[in-house]
Amino acid sequence: MFVRVKKAAAALALGSFAVAGAVSVAVTPASPAGAASSGSTVTIADLCSCTGPEASSISQTSDTMQAWASWVNSHGGLAGHQVHLVILDDGYSAAKALTNAETAINQDHAVALFDNSDEDPSFAATVQSAHVPVLGGQESDSGYKNSDFFPAGATFNYTNSVGAIFAKDAGVKKMAAVYCVEVAICAESVHQGQVVAAHYGIKYVYVSSIGFAAPNYTAQCLAAKESGATAMTVGDASSVVEHVVTDCAAQGYTPRELSGDGTVAAAWLKIPAFNGNIDSQADNLWFLHNTATSTMYSALDKYAPGVPSGPNFGEIVLQSWSDGALLQAAVKAAGASAATPLTSAAILKGLYGLPTGETLGGLSPALHFVKGQPANNSCFFEMGIKNGKFVALHGGTTICAPLVKAGTLPTSH
């Protein structure tokens, strides 16, 4: 229902951001794959699609992970080990993404990886065979199919189900869906969305692919209007969503806009046609200032002030921060200390041993991982736009879609 491009959220006008370096100045000595460096430094790698037609928002995740590492290091590190963060950009190349993962594991000797890549299927088998845990994947097929991925929130297989629940509650019966032609998952999400939506009495009456570089989307807007759709989902980068919504409004067509996760951006608040927008989020809501988000905001304000003040500050930032918080929770659950090396095996032990109902201090729905099984979490947060402001819906609590077998997609309930 909520067709989304994984991590393709912010305005493409932001330009590109590519990093292959470290937050910490410490150099990681050579050591076996999955083993921590000697001394008090541990390497973590952030694999990202930092450049490409759908990825300018990834600069926010890189800045966020750097801020996370700096904050952790200034507060004692991971169980006494200083974090050496390496950020590797695949540029939307599957081959490069695989090379980056191999480099992170075999050369940088990273004991854990953050997934900010749209090409993660290319390295999923590699990281699994190396037994190096991947933190993240809330917006990824790998996040619910591969047991080596540990999403710090709801899993992607339930996105359309919970989107259909939200749409039904809003009285939607006819939907329009336009989606990016550049990334395969866009079309795949639409197909699955149609199947799930039908169970909730919602029909997709107009579906069309769009290109991010199109001069306008007037034709699609007029066709969607003619179809009688009262709601629309745009599976593309945030700037493209803005363009579509603005073009449709110019044609006198203002359907309720449905979206979620990384797509939502602060710039939407200035566009009247977004009023009434409804979004699903795999983690808690980034715009809330409360005990759950206080540490994130403190770290961003100190180490990456351009992130929260930017026009495209959004949920993708909180998701990335949550991935870091999950790693911290796993290290704590493993009982790691500065006296012993921090290894991939220890982190995996901690991930499987998280306390029952772990929410990372309120950042996520309750998390639970089972050894040998992919993550399976159907609980999302709901938000929207009302009178030019982001608002938490459903009392700020989660709404859960019916569970299906781990590693599978819901088709009907």
Residue map of PLM features:
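Periplasmic-binding protein-like
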Residues: 104-117, 135-137, 174-179, 228-238, ...
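Hydrophobic alpha-helical segments within soluble ligand-binding/sensing domains
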Residues: 97, 151-176, 187, 215-218, ...
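Extracellular/periplasmic periplasmic-binding protein-like sensory domains
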Residues: 247-321, 396-400, 410-411
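Beta-alpha junction/loop-to-helix N-cap segments that form part of ligand/metal-binding clefts
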Residues: 36-41, 56-63, 75-143, 210-217, ...
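An alpha-beta-alpha
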Residues: 50, 149-212, 230-231, 318
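Extracellular/periplasmic bilobed ligand-binding domains
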Residues: 130, 189-286
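C-terminal region of N-terminal signal peptides and the immediate post-cleavage residues
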Residues: 19-40
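Segments of small-molecule ligand-sensing domains
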Residues: 307-317, 328-392
